[in-house]
């Protein structure tokens, strides 16, 4: 009996010491953020200066993530000159946002958001919309050489908008090589035709390659972006192209990086939770950021990921039966949604209604390769990261407490 008690005591003291090690570290590596005032991001300034691409990760649905995104973007623009927002949008959507940022035409911006509203997507919300308006207001205070622009690297989301952009490239050009493409983009889009479109785009991309000189004469210095649009269109059907969404994002990033000469530019963008992880998830595989950091791309070793974790918050969920948005609990200490290992330590070090930044990659960090603040339990089972090649899934965590939901735009928007 005494041996059993001694063994239990040793195990308990070991677990307590391990937890205390994490808590002690976190106490000395945290900053409380004021999203409505002068937010302090100095804790990550050194990493921002020494790296190229900062990725903010969040599970879509919490309002505070939009506030964090704008606050961090504004800080990076001011301190290290970040202008290029690498967006989880397709290129046509980002082009429309850029047009709005330039001329303030809200009809153009509304067209982007109307697609999400029509498709009951979380992104069709006031908070995202207002963030774009705030970015335009910020740009108007900056010289043109420092203004923020968006670059979309996602698969095609809004085909109608995408076809309009391609049609703008075609313009009034007359050439037999363009006729088949013009027929496709001027036809009304139907989801049932996605395989047909994907195959057509693949074949058309090959046509461009075979007739490069003639296409160069037609498009001049616009040809690289035109080719990018066609190649991304070929990824539309994963079944036919063999290119899933994370792989398409990765390929598109590499293409635009070269076309837009991002080599010496600072890059930033907010992405979905799993897209931002720098390690693959066991039994799920790699996503955008993990593909990038594992590659031989020039920016691969210059990526910093910052992930937002919600506690006692709310998010918007579409109720198909009631055909309306409903406000649901959003807390990553809940196994019915996702319980992140070690998140109770963050909760113990923060207060209600706070937003707190934790740096987990400092020298002698106890988090390296542990899975703490990454591994977790979901209804589908255990979520486990593969840490064989990297120490951290991300370098920073932001705990969002008591965030409201994203306020949905009305169906009549």
Feature map (PLM): residue ranges:
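N- or domain-start disorder-to-order transition segments that initiate the globular core
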Residues: 16-52, 108-109, 137
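C-terminal regions of proteins
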Residues: 20, 26-27, 276-413
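Alpha-helical scaffolding within the catalytic cores
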Residues: 31-43, 71, 99, 251-259, ...
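An N-terminal structural lobe/cap that precedes and organizes the functional/catalytic core
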Residues: 41-86, 91-98
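Structural recognition of the beta-strand scaffold that forms the well-ordered cores
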Residues: 54-56, 83-88, 149-152, 266-270, ...
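Solvent-exposed loop/turn segments at secondary-structure junctions
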Residues: 59-63, 90-94, 155-159, 273-277, ...
